[in-house]
Amino acid sequence: MGKVIGIDLGTTNSCVAVMDGKSPRVIENAEGMRTTPSIVALTDDDERLVGQPAKRQAVTNPEKTIFAVKRLIGRRYDDPTVAKDKDLVPYKIVKASNGDAWVEADGKIYSPSQISAFILQKMKETAEAHLGQKVDQAVITVPAYFNDAQRQATKDAGKIAGLEVLRIINEPTAAALAYGLDKAKQGTIAVYDLGGGTFDVSVLEIGDGVFEVKSTNGDTFLGGEDFDMRLVGYLADEFQKEQGINLRNDKLALQRLKEAAEKAKIELSSTTQTEINLPFITADASGPKHLTMKLTRAKFEALVDDLVQKTIEPCRKALKDAGLSAGEISEVVLVGGMTRMPKIQEVVKQFFGKEPHKGVNPDEVVAIGAAIQAGVLQGDVKDVLLLDVTPLSLGIETLGGVFTRIIERNTTIPTKKSQVFSTAEDNQNAVTIRVFQGEREMAADNKALGQFDLMGIPPAPRGMPQIEVTFDIDANGIVNVSAKDKATGKEQQIRIQASGGLSESEIEKMVKEAEANAAEDKKRREAVDAKNHADALVHSTEKALAEHGSKVGEGERKAIEDALADLKEALKGDDSEAIKAKSNTLAQASMKLGEAMYQQQAEGDAARDAAQDAAKDDVVDAEFTEVDDDKNDKKSA
């Protein structure tokens, strides 16, 4: 069995880690960074960029640079939270044929799972480069408050990326694993996790290697991106007041504002004032316009105060569900880049009544926890037991559109529960089971996960047939539902696939596309390598010809010059095979030149050695007389 890696698939940044012996280790990417921006860009020449290279070109290619796609994963296009994002991102969010929110770039539409798969592929390649072996299994983290559709979509992303996802693990739980491993601590901790796009809070009991989640709560559409967008809105409004130009209509300006807002937000965590300076942000008939503005920490905190306060209600609910007061929490662990913001730390301290623990790296701790869980599954990490919970209640729609819960929220998983229902009409021969997830009393107000029919029920008065509905949640938090007619033994079951979601055939198609893209990327990389090698060969040959061309015959020199001209011509195109062939021809033709250079060097070395030997022969040995000190000592009187 190869290595199982742990991946934190984040909204803003992603991170990959692996167990190195008994210790988890974060792996640096090709750019030497420990985290990778969760950004994918498609360039004009059909190249796909992921991570830092994608982020670097975002300003000049805003419509084809996709970021924060995790906020769309497993969501419907008509979801109000999607509508909110649609106006704020420079790329296009479109409605897929299944009603899900997808993204469009370069005339093609991509599912959020596909875009996430490109990021996961980058994580996979990062791990493979470090380990020197193929990696095809992973533990991937998701926000604790992700519903079934979002978990399934994340698992699909792993499959498209060529990874077998052994476990989907909740981010706060992963952070608790990283915090609690190798610590002899016992007690109840709260993990406050405010990342780039999601917020979670989990209450856990830790002791003797057992990590038991007591409750979890959160908001899957609240994170650093919202703080950035709030600042973008403020900057755009101020500029419009001053210049009368709405920057929201300019995709390029919007992307520059987004980058400036993120930078200012980060700076204000360590300084009380920053300056935002964006020259040539736009232009009108009177000429170019510049945006220059000073922003204080106090002003920024006032702009986002409601977002900060929004994190407190989930904390309150999580404590209530766990049956605990804030005073009974022994430690509060901060996770996610947003927790570096002083205002967040202050609010957490006020609510829990204690200084939060800042001893973990908020950007890396989740990936480290995922690697530990990978180690547990591989058998490398012993004596660790993780007991997680389902974040939302699961149930079915019953008569009158009521949501009847079968599994309550915060139930430890894996779990299996059954309940018996009956028919609503006389002689009813089929029932439709509609499955929902959520906390509202009416089914329609909750998240519809899917539906299926149980057919062939024998005719009987209403209320007589006994239909047993069973919910089975696995360790990934993914749901299976079955319905059985107890009289006939007939059973119907489904692995929940949201009314949206990706079908098996769609996933297979995307897997094949990803493999084809990987092959295409490899070809493109080989072409770049061939060009680089050819450029270096041209340079070295020209230099050698200039310095040593006179040492070879006229015919040999002409052969080298012709091969050089052919290679230069080939370099004007993109045919890597032609470039390789012409490079080989030039290398062969240049061999005589190389021989002449080496011969000259050998002759020079021989002459130098001869000169040194002659110099040695001319050395005169000095004559000396040994003096015996004892004989020279005068005897004392």
UniProtKB/Swiss-Prot annotation:
Bias-annotated ranges (Basic and acidic residues): 605-619
* InterPro entries xref list: ATPase_NBD (IPR043129), Chaperone_DnaK (IPR012725), Heat_shock_70_CS (IPR018181), HSP70_C_sf (IPR029048), HSP70_peptide-bd_sf (IPR029047), Hsp_70_fam (IPR013126)
Gene3D superfamilies from the xrefs?
1.20.1270.10, 3.30.420.40, Actin, Chain A, domain 4, Substrate Binding Domain Of DNAk, Chain A, domain 1
Induction or repression: By stress conditions e.g. heat shock.
Q: Does the keyword Phosphoprotein apply?
A: yes
Keyword list (alphabetical) reads: ATP-binding, Chaperone, Nucleotide-binding, Phosphoprotein, Stress response
Q: Which residues carry this modification: Phosphothreonine?
A: T198
The biased composition feature labelled Acidic residues covers 620-630
- A Pfam match: HSP70
* SUPFAM superfamilies reported in the protein's UniProt record: Actin-like ATPase domain, Heat shock protein 70kD (HSP70), C-terminal subdomain, Heat shock protein 70kD (HSP70), peptide-binding domain
- Can you name one GO molecular function term for this protein? unfolded protein binding
**Could you tell me which PROSITE patterns the record lists for this protein?**
HSP70_1, HSP70_2, HSP70_3
**Where do the record's region annotations for Disordered lie?**
597-637
**Record-stated family:** Belongs to the heat shock protein 70 family.
The function of this protein is:
Acts as a chaperone.
Q: Which PANTHER family match?
A: HEAT SHOCK PROTEIN 70KDA (PTHR19375)
Q: What is this protein called?
A: Chaperone protein DnaK
**Could you tell me the gene encoding this protein?**
dnaK
